[in-house]
């Protein structure tokens, strides 16, 4: 925790930047993905280049999937038997869409990294195990890839930068970042309390959570000899969150 901050008291996974090619070059990669359990179709494309002091890499990935197939024709939810028409979990289709960009500048003793990424996911919930049981909502609608109520969607946006300067026996570095986590769950209004009124705004928004995180870390490392290394650092974090939805108490 002295080296990585208080959140590392239980351990840390140190994810290092991508390895920079030794020579100037342009490179790329493409991958396709398919799954039979839910008809997943997806792909990913990566492009990058090294030009003198600059190294840049970007990636875009997306996948779509349909309702999950299961080896059962019924499930029990709150003591009620719920049928699975066609042995499929209705409304469990979804999609994922991710994009990332990374660039690095390295000249002599100075190095700086900049990264931005956005991850989006939308998934349907099986209506037979969400909210008040209702067999009528389980009827096959003929479309295994549509997303209806109830569903969840999550978006995670992140900006980070790493700055570093080295002298003969001193290394000064800093990490600064911002994260935005936004999660929502939508479901037709339902309640176990007869006195709870229908919300005037977004009546079907069951849960919502928004988290803003600003973080910074500065570290000074002194290499006095081959046997000793001294480190001094400063770490700070600021968070702000908000919640909404009729299921939040």
Where in this protein do the model-derived segments appear?
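Flexible loop and strand-edge segments within Gram-negative outer membrane beta-barrel domains
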Residues: 65, 90-96, 110-166, 178-210
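Short loop/turn motifs that connect adjacent beta-strands in outer-membrane beta-barrel proteins
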Residues: 4, 20-26, 53, 109, ...
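Transmembrane beta-strands of outer-membrane beta-barrel proteins
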Residues: 26-30, 56-58, 112-114, 170-176, ...
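Flexible, solvent-exposed coil segments and beta strand-coil junctions
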Residues: 20-28, 74-84, 134-144, 154, ...
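N-terminal periplasmic accessory domains that precede
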Residues: 8-32, 41-46
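Structural signature of outer-membrane beta-barrel domains
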Residues: 1, 18, 35-37, 63-67, ...
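Signature of Gram-negative outer-membrane beta-barrel scaffolds
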Residues: 221-223, 227-249
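Transmembrane beta-barrel wall of Gram-negative outer-membrane proteins
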Residues: 38-64, 77-126, 155, 161, ...
């Amino acid at each position: 925790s002295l080296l990585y901050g208080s959140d590392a008291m239980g351990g840390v996974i140190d994810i290092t930047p991508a390895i920079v090619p030794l020579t100037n070059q342009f490179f790329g990669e493409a991958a396709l993905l398919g799954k039979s359990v839910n008809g997943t179709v997806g792909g990913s494309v990566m492009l990058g280049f090294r030009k003198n002091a600059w190294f840049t890499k970007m990636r875009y990935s997306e996948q779509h999937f349909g309702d999950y197939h299961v080896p059962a024709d019924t499930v029990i939810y709150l003591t009620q038997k719920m049928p699975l028409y066609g042995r499929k979990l209705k409304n469990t289709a979804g999609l994922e869409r991710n994009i990332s960009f990374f660039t690095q500048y390295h000249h002599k003793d100075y190095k700086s990294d900049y990264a931005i990424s956005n991850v989006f996911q939308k998934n349907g919930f099986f209506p037979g195990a969400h909210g008040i049981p209702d067999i009528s909502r389980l009827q096959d609608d003929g479309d295994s890839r549509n997303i209806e109520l109830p569903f969840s969607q999550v978006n995670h946006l992140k900006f980070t930068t790493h700055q570093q300067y080295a002298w003969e026996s001193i290394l000064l570095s800093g990490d600064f970042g911002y994260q935005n986590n936004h999660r929502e769950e939508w479901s037709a209004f339902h309640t176990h309390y007869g006195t709870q009124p229908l919300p005037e705004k977004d009546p079907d928004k069951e849960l919502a959570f928004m988290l803003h995180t600003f973080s910074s870390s500065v570290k000074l490392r002194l290499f006095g000899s081959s046997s000793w290394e001294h480190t001094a650092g400063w770490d700070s974090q600021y968070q702000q969150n908000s919640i909404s939805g009729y299921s939040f108490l």
